[in-house]
């Protein structure tokens, strides 16, 4: 094995190597066995997954990540999940614009419904179940794009705790919180 420093070092593959190592070692995985006094919890509002990513997304989450890393260096067990806000009006608008459709709750579901390959000039009225299906399909794609970005940036979140606000579990938790008021 040569210890000589190369004339031109290569960074190819370093990012993937370290990301894979951190993931396999559970470097940022939250340890639920820690006592409450040892835990530092970060609750960030999940980014709205309804469009294009921009530098503002990276800028705002970098601040939080710096705090998470600082707390870990100080010995805290950091609870830092990541979520996606993909439930509500922004998602509906994104689906309407992306597919050229609008929800008509009076229409019956169409068996084997497929979205138009290109958005029509006038919005196509579709049933609520078909509309919800398109919402779930598009948000899954958008969530993956967001996750790819955050992983590439190297956010130190616990990926095993990721959630989405459109998921049944998150909706039920939200409803329980509102009902408890």
List the predicted regions and their residue ranges:
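N-terminal, positively charged nucleic-acid-binding surface of large information/translation enzymes
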Residues: 1-181
């Amino acid at each position: 094995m040569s210890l000589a420093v190369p004339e031109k070092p290569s960074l190819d593959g370093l990012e993937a190597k370290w990301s894979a190592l951190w993931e396999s070692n559970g470097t940022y995985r939250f340890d639920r066995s820690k006592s409450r006094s040892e835990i530092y919890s970060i609750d960030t509002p999940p980014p709205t997954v309804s469009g294009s990513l921009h530098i503002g997304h990276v800028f705002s989450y970098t601040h939080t990540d710096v705090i998470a890393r600082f707390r870990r260096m100080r010995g805290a067990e950091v609870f830092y999940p990541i979520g996606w806000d993909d439930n509500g009006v922004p998602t509906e608008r994104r689906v309407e614009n992306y597919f050229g459709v609008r929800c008509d709750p009076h229409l019956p579901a169409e068996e084997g419904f497929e979205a138009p390959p290109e958005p029509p000039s006038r919005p196509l009225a579709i049933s609520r179940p078909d509309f919800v299906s398109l919402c779930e399909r598009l948000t899954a794609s958008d969530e993956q794009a967001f996750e790819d970005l955050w992983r590439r940036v190297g956010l130190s979140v616990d990926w095993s705790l990721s959630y989405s606000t459109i998921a049944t579990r998150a909706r039920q938790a939200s409803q329980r919180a509102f009902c408890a008021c």
